UniProtKB/Swiss-Prot annotation:
<feature type="binding site">
    <location>
        <position position="15"/>
    </location>
    <ligand>
        <name>Mn(2+) 2</name>
    </ligand>
</feature>
<feature type="binding site">
    <location>
        <position position="75"/>
    </location>
    <ligand>
        <name>Mn(2+) 1</name>
    </ligand>
</feature>
<protein>
    <recommendedName>
        <fullName>Probable manganese-dependent inorganic pyrophosphatase</fullName>
        <ecNumber>3.6.1.1</ecNumber>
    </recommendedName>
</protein>
<feature type="binding site">
    <location>
        <position position="9"/>
    </location>
    <ligand>
        <name>Mn(2+) 1</name>
    </ligand>
</feature>
<keyword id="KW-0479">Metal-binding</keyword>
<dbReference type="Pfam" id="PF02833">
    <property type="entry name" value="DHHA2"/>
</dbReference>
<dbReference type="Pfam" id="PF01368">
    <property type="entry name" value="DHH"/>
</dbReference>
<keyword id="KW-0378">Hydrolase</keyword>
<dbReference type="GO" id="GO:0030145">
    <property type="term" value="F:manganese ion binding"/>
</dbReference>
<keyword id="KW-0963">Cytoplasm</keyword>
<dbReference type="GO" id="GO:0004427">
    <property type="term" value="F:inorganic diphosphate phosphatase activity"/>
</dbReference>
<dbReference type="InterPro" id="IPR001667">
    <property type="entry name" value="DDH_dom"/>
</dbReference>
<dbReference type="InterPro" id="IPR038222">
    <property type="entry name" value="DHHA2_dom_sf"/>
</dbReference>
<feature type="binding site">
    <location>
        <position position="75"/>
    </location>
    <ligand>
        <name>Mn(2+) 2</name>
    </ligand>
</feature>
<dbReference type="InterPro" id="IPR038763">
    <property type="entry name" value="DHH_sf"/>
</dbReference>
<comment type="similarity">
    <text>Belongs to the PPase class C family.</text>
</comment>
<feature type="binding site">
    <location>
        <position position="13"/>
    </location>
    <ligand>
        <name>Mn(2+) 1</name>
    </ligand>
</feature>
Length: 309
C-alpha cells in the first residue's frame, strides 16, 4: 500500500498539526496502515505545549515531492496555503472548515467541509459516526485544536458543536477545559523572544481576493502594545516580504486573547481599503478593532468585499 501524506496548511497552527495527526489515526482505523501525518512548517509554542502535555510526537516536516502521491488535506484547501507541489498530487480527501477557493482536482474525491469553528470538531464527528474508539491523546489533541481555533470558545466562529465536542472529550483527555485552555493559549502568546520576521510568519496565510493577493498574519498575545511597540521593525519586514512575494496588501492582526479585541497594522498600496472594510480610519497604518478575534470570519470576508467592490 502506498503512503498517504496527511497535512494542514503552511505556518501550521494547533488545528493544522492536531488534525493531521488525528486524521492519520482515523485513516489507520479504516485500514490505511500507510497514513502518515506531516507538517508544512515549524511547531509553534502553543502547539508544542499541547503535544508535550499529551505526550504526542510532532509530525515530520514534509520535504518529499508530491507528484503522483496520495494526499489528504486537513484544515485548508487553497493551493497557495498548501505544499509547493500540491498541484501535482492526487488529492483523495479534504476535511476543512474554511472557504473553498483556488482549489481543483483532476479526479473525484471525498470532501467534507462544515461551518464549524475547528477541523478537529469535524473529525470528532467522523469518529462518532464510524463508532471508532477515541484514544485519550487523540481526545486531548481534539480539545487543544478546538480551544486554539475558538480562543477558548470566545471566537464568533465557535459553534455549539465545537463546545459540545470539547465537553464530551474532557473526561477522556483528563483536563479541565478552562484551566488547560488558558495555560495553552498563554504558552503561545509570548512574543518577546521572537524577531519581527518570526512574529509575521507564526500564523500567516495568503488569500486571492479578486485581482489582489493579500497576506494576513495573526499574533495572539496578552499585551498588544508589547507587539506593536516594534512597529518600525514589523513594517519593514512586512514591506520586504510584500516586495519579495508580490503581495498587494499585508495585514497584521494582533489579538488580545484576554479581552477579545485586536489592533491591525497594514502596509500596501490598497491599505485604505482595509480602513473602509472595518469602517475605521487608519492612523499611521494602524487601527483598533473592538471585538475582532477571528481572521476567518471577521477579517478575510470584510477585506475581500472591500477589495472587489
Amino acid at each position: 500500500m502506498a503512503k498517504t501524506y496527511i497535512f494542514g496548511h503552511q505556518n501550521p497552527d494547533t488545528d493544522a498539526i492536531a488534525s493531521a495527526i488525528i486524521m492519520a489515526d482515523f485513516e489507520q482505523l479504516t485500514g490505511n496502515s500507510e497514513a502518515t501525518p506531516y507538517r508544512l512548517g515549524d511547531i509553534n509554542p502553543e502547539t508544542k505545549f499541547a503535544l508535550d502535555h499529551f505526550e504526542v510526537k510532532a509530525p515530520e516536516l514534509l520535504s518529499d515531492n508530491l507528484d503522483g502521491r496520495e494526499v489528504i488535506l486537513v484544515d485548508h484547501n487553497e493551493f497557495q496555503q498548501s505544499a509547493e507541489t500540491i498541484s501535482d498530487a492526487e488529492i483523495k480527501h479534504v476535511v476543512d472548515h474554511h472557504r473553498i477557493a483556488n482549489f481543483e482536482t483532476a479526479s473525484p474525491l471525498w470532501y467534507r467541509a462544515e461551518p464549524v469553528g475547528c477541523t478537529a470538531t469535524i473529525l470528532y464527528k467522523m469518529y462518532k459516526e464510524r463508532g471508532f474508539e477515541i484514544k485519550p491523546h487523540i481526545a486531548g489533541l481534539m480539545i487543544s485544536a478546538i480551544i486554539s481555533d475558538s480562543l477558548l470558545f470566545k471566537s464568533p466562529t465557535c459553534t455549539d458543536e465545537d463546545v459540545n465536542a470539547a465537553k464530551d472529550l474532557k473526561d477522556l483527555a483528563n483536563v479541565d477545559l478552562d484551566e488547560y485552555g488558558l495555560e495553552m493559549l498563554k504558552a503561545g502568546a509570548s512574543t518577546t523572544d521572537k524577531s519581527a520576521e518570526e512574529l509575521l510568519d507564526m500564523d500567516a496565510k495568503s488569500f486571492n481576493m479578486g485581482d489582489y493577493v493579500t497576506r494576513i498574519a495573526q499574533v495572539n498575545t496578552v499585551d498588544i502594545d508589547e507587539v506593536l511597540n516594534r512597529k518600525e521593525d514589523l513594517e519593514k519586514a512586512m514591506l520586504e516580504t510584500s516586495a519579495n512575494e508580490k503581495y498587494d496588501l499585508f495585514v497584521l492582526v494582533v489579538t488580545d486573547i484576554i479581552n477579545s479585541d485586536s489592533k491591525i497594522l497594514v502596509v500596501g498600496a490598497e491599505k485604505d481599503k482595509v480602513g473602509e472594510a472595518f469602517k475605521v480610519q487608519l492612523d499611521d497604518g494602524m487601527a483598533f478593532l473592538s471585538g475582532v478575534v477571528s481572521r476567518k470570519k471577521q477579517v478575510v470576508p470584510q477585506i475581500t468585499d472591500a477589495l472587489i467592490k
